[in-house]
UniProtKB/Swiss-Prot annotation:
The lineage of its organism: Bacteria, Bacillati, Actinomycetota, Actinomycetes, Mycobacteriales. The keyword Disulfide bond does not apply. One of the primary rRNA binding proteins, it binds directly near the 3'-end of the 23S rRNA, where it nucleates assembly of the 50S subunit. The gene is rplC. GO terms for biological process: translation. It comes from the Bacteria. This is Large ribosomal subunit protein uL3. One of its GO terms (molecular function) is rRNA binding. HAMAP family: Ribosomal_uL3_B. Belongs to the universal ribosomal protein uL3 family. GO terms for cellular component: cytosolic large ribosomal subunit. It comes from Mycobacterium leprae (strain TN). Pfam families: Ribosomal_L3. PANTHER family: 50S RIBOSOMAL PROTEIN L3 (PTHR11229), LARGE RIBOSOMAL SUBUNIT PROTEIN UL3C (PTHR11229:SF16).
Amino acid sequence: MARKGILGTKLGMTQVFDENNRVVPVTVVKAGPNVVTRIRTLERDGYSAVQLAYGEISPRKVNKPVTGQYNSAGVNPRRYLAELRLDHPDAAAEYEVGQELTAEIFADATYVDVTGTSKGKGFSGTMKRHGFRGQGASHGAQAVHRRPGSIGGCATPARVFKGTRMAGRMGNDRVTVQNLLVHKVDTENGVLLIKGAVPGRTGGLVMVRSAIKRGEK
């Protein structure tokens, strides 16, 4: 069986009780339905993957090149397109163009990896962005309490090294959280209850895939 994946929407967090009456914090993800719009094979494309489409959108908001992709697949335009890389070249045979994927594909899954876009924090200083300690609060410190300090030498090396941690835009990055437990799969409503937090804001797009490090199929 190929590694499974589906596009969905983060609906927010809540808490449920397990069989031992312990509180479990879960993230509610509306998973799918997705439709397969293209299958990439090792022979033709150099890698194995399936292209998934998700979300409603008015056809007049889709440009002509993208509309042509949907027309060739014989499906209505969707808001999002993403590729799911397959872990084995023969796994593409398990999919076909026009096939619909729902939350039911994770009925037997135990752990998943969730990818999303983290919340943007705006321009942030080094203490918030990188966890710097800051400088002295007193004993002669004047208006330098939250400054980063030295960023390099003067004559040598006479430059700032690439990758130096400094203030800047924080968040709005692609983030993957691995090995999250699937607490429940509600196939009737197309919802996944995933233990713990997943990246992104409420209403954000997420990709849920079977956990690669645990060998989930």
